[in-house]
């Protein structure tokens, strides 16, 4: 019977001494409190340069899991694209050049789709603005921006500033206009809510929407009047001089998001010949280009293809003939699989995966426990089975409920998680295993912005916990650690040599 090493990633569980609308600190968490007092622990970095992001940039789930799973600082797409813009090589990119050439050759339209936001988690509006300028320089005559609105990694009603910037730039360049707006709730689903994606797709491609207005700003104002914040803006078309924009054959579409997980579904709707999740009028003959690779199965050009890291934690475990399990509910399943494996879709030999469906609710404050009880049932069974050397799991609650801005619901989510942690602790200690608890970034640790007194729905840049639960004696060996130090720590406790590609350091030393 194997002694399991378990890594528990509490998504969005940051650390803050402040009790100001801190759902984690103010929730009733007897198990977490006792673990924090009794077992070896430290705080580690999960944002900024320490995870390969620009200085001061908050971390996110994709970045966090890549850094944890790879055991090294992985420089993120945001950083790479920023560098290309800074070095003035962005416009020389082959895939972007081909998309522009297609438009010029066919005298067709260039469509930019993506999250118009300064959030820096899924996209950055500066990339969109740079793309607009390059299109003008390259001789594009008609450019249409289909703006997805944020309100999740940014304040809930903050899109006006971004829309005004985009409007002014397009007007100054006499190039085109914002042709549709849509909350990310619709265009950037990742939970197979194809009815949402269908609404976004139809607005962009067919100019078919529930609402039509004369400007993007008017669309936003009317959405607010319906009490729909940026994230939930119903897909809306913009009519200019009596004209509605559609995506037509021979057009080029460039998807400006750099993060994969919430860009996949609508990309498949654009590109799959045999797409069947909702009816399309026809399969478009277009040039579809993505800023980064969203899914290796997508048939499209990629401007910044991925670099495949070697000797990730999963690969090292496989090479050492260890069994491993990855488990999460739908919202975070790609993170413990694709992202944790450094952008690899395929399972390693000896790697099992369990996907627990996320509850079908409009927003997760309506069901703060999400699917944590079911995840825990499967986890406890896996520990008891003695089948796995290493288990990696993710609990989505503190992030997904944190994003709703509902403080009371976030506290309920934390309290549900505390009960789950109690069950895991008992199972691990009973079987003489090792459990590490950490987070990929903060979120529920600040539910209200202290400066504005408004709901804070974005991630935080706070440190995150890293705690060891087990019978081994452990001492903190590394102060000021970071997410990339977690994999070396797991290898250390498992007695496996750390490969040279892993540049992280072990956080705890364990008595032999």
Curated annotation (Swiss-Prot):
<dbReference type="InterPro" id="IPR006124">
    <property type="entry name" value="Metalloenzyme"/>
</dbReference>
<keyword id="KW-0413">Isomerase</keyword>
<dbReference type="InterPro" id="IPR005995">
    <property type="entry name" value="Pgm_bpd_ind"/>
</dbReference>
<dbReference type="Pfam" id="PF06415">
    <property type="entry name" value="iPGM_N"/>
</dbReference>
<feature type="binding site">
    <location>
        <position position="440"/>
    </location>
    <ligand>
        <name>Mn(2+) 2</name>
    </ligand>
</feature>
<feature type="binding site">
    <location>
        <position position="459"/>
    </location>
    <ligand>
        <name>Mn(2+) 1</name>
    </ligand>
</feature>
<dbReference type="InterPro" id="IPR011258">
    <property type="entry name" value="BPG-indep_PGM_N"/>
</dbReference>
<feature type="binding site">
    <location>
        <position position="332"/>
    </location>
    <ligand>
        <name>substrate</name>
    </ligand>
</feature>
<feature type="binding site">
    <location>
        <position position="190"/>
    </location>
    <ligand>
        <name>substrate</name>
    </ligand>
</feature>
<feature type="binding site">
    <location>
        <begin position="152"/>
        <end position="153"/>
    </location>
    <ligand>
        <name>substrate</name>
    </ligand>
</feature>
<feature type="binding site">
    <location>
        <position position="61"/>
    </location>
    <ligand>
        <name>Mn(2+) 2</name>
    </ligand>
</feature>
<dbReference type="InterPro" id="IPR017850">
    <property type="entry name" value="Alkaline_phosphatase_core_sf"/>
</dbReference>
<dbReference type="GO" id="GO:0005829">
    <property type="term" value="C:cytosol"/>
</dbReference>
<dbReference type="GO" id="GO:0030145">
    <property type="term" value="F:manganese ion binding"/>
</dbReference>
<feature type="binding site">
    <location>
        <position position="11"/>
    </location>
    <ligand>
        <name>Mn(2+) 2</name>
    </ligand>
</feature>
<dbReference type="Pfam" id="PF01676">
    <property type="entry name" value="Metalloenzyme"/>
</dbReference>
<comment type="subunit">
    <text>Monomer.</text>
</comment>
<feature type="binding site">
    <location>
        <begin position="259"/>
        <end position="262"/>
    </location>
    <ligand>
        <name>substrate</name>
    </ligand>
</feature>
<protein>
    <recommendedName>
        <fullName>2,3-bisphosphoglycerate-independent phosphoglycerate mutase</fullName>
        <ecNumber>5.4.2.12</ecNumber>
    </recommendedName>
</protein>
<dbReference type="GO" id="GO:0006007">
    <property type="term" value="P:glucose catabolic process"/>
</dbReference>
<comment type="function">
    <text>Catalyzes the interconversion of 2-phosphoglycerate and 3-phosphoglycerate.</text>
</comment>
<keyword id="KW-0324">Glycolysis</keyword>
<dbReference type="InterPro" id="IPR036646">
    <property type="entry name" value="PGAM_B_sf"/>
</dbReference>
<feature type="binding site">
    <location>
        <position position="399"/>
    </location>
    <ligand>
        <name>Mn(2+) 1</name>
    </ligand>
</feature>
<keyword id="KW-0479">Metal-binding</keyword>
<feature type="active site" description="Phosphoserine intermediate">
    <location>
        <position position="61"/>
    </location>
</feature>
<feature type="binding site">
    <location>
        <position position="403"/>
    </location>
    <ligand>
        <name>Mn(2+) 1</name>
    </ligand>
</feature>
<comment type="similarity">
    <text>Belongs to the BPG-independent phosphoglycerate mutase family.</text>
</comment>
<dbReference type="GO" id="GO:0004619">
    <property type="term" value="F:phosphoglycerate mutase activity"/>
</dbReference>
<feature type="binding site">
    <location>
        <position position="441"/>
    </location>
    <ligand>
        <name>Mn(2+) 2</name>
    </ligand>
</feature>
<keyword id="KW-0464">Manganese</keyword>
<dbReference type="GO" id="GO:0006096">
    <property type="term" value="P:glycolytic process"/>
</dbReference>
<comment type="pathway">
    <text>Carbohydrate degradation; glycolysis; pyruvate from D-glyceraldehyde 3-phosphate: step 3/5.</text>
</comment>
<feature type="binding site">
    <location>
        <position position="184"/>
    </location>
    <ligand>
        <name>substrate</name>
    </ligand>
</feature>
<feature type="binding site">
    <location>
        <position position="122"/>
    </location>
    <ligand>
        <name>substrate</name>
    </ligand>
</feature>
């Amino acid at each position: 019977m194997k002694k399991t090493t378990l890594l528990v990633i509490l998504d969005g569980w940051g650390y803050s001494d402040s009790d100001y609308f801190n759902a984690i600190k103010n929730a009733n968490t007897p198990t977490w409190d006792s673990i924090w007092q009794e077992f070896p622990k430290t705080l580690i970095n999960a944002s900024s340069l320490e995870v390969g992001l620009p200085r001061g940039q908050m971390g996110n789930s994709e970045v966090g899991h890549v850094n944890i799973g790879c055991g090294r600082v992985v420089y993120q797409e945001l950083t790479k694209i920023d560098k290309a813009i800074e070095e003035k090589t962005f416009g020389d990119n082959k895939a972007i050049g081909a998309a522009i050439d297609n438009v010029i050759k066919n005298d067709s339209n260039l469509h930019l789709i993506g999250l118009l936001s300064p959030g820096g988690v899924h996209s950055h509006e500066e990339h969109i603005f740079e793309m607009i300028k390059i299109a003008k320089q390259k001789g594009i005559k008609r450019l249409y921006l289909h703006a997805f609105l944020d309100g999740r990694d940014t304040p809930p009603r903050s899109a006006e500033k971004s829309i005004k910037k985009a409007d002014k730039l397009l007007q100054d360049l006499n190039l085109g206009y914002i042709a549709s707006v849509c909350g990310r709730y619709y265009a950037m689903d990742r939970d197979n809510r194809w009815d949402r994606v269908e609404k976004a797709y139809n607005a962009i491609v067919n100019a078919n929407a529930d609402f039509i207005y004369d400007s993007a700003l008017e669309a936003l104002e009317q959405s607010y009047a319906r009490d729909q914040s940026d994230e939930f803006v119903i897909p809306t078309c913009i009519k200019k001089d009596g004209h509605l924009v559609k995506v037509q054959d021979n057009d080029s579409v460039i998807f400006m998001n750099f993060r994969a997980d919430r860009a996949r579904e609508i990309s498949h709707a654009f590109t799959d010949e045999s797409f069947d999740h909702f009816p399309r009028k026809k399969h478009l003959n277009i040039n579809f280009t993505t800023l980064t690779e969203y899914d290796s199965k997508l048939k499209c050009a990629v401007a910044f293809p991925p670099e495949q890291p070697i000797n990730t934690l999963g690969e090292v475990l496989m090479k050492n003939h260890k069994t491993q399990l990855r488990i999460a509910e739908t919202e975070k399943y790609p993170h413990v699989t694709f992202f944790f494996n450094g952008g690899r879709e395929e399972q390693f030999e000896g790697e099992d995966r369990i996907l627990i469906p996320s509850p079908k609710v409009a927003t997760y404050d309506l069901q703060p426990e999400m699917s944590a009880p079911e995840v825990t049932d499967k986890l406890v069974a896996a520990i008891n089975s003695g089948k796995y050397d290493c288990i990696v799991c993710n609990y989505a609650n503190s992030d997904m409920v944190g994003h709703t801005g509902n403080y009371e619901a976030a506290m309920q989510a934390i309290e549900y998680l505390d009960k789950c942690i109690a069950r895991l602790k008992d199972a691990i200690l009973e079987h003489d295993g090792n459990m590490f608890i950490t987070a990929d970034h903060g979120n529920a640790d600040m539910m209200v912005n202290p400066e504005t007194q408004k709901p804070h729905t974005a991630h935080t840049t706070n440190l995150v916990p890293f705690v060891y639960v087990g019978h081994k004696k452990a001492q903190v060996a590394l102060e000021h650690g970071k997410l990339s130090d977690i994999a070396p720590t797991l290898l250390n406790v498992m007695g496996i040599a750390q490969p040279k590609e892993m540049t992280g350091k072990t956080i705890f030393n364990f008595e032999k």
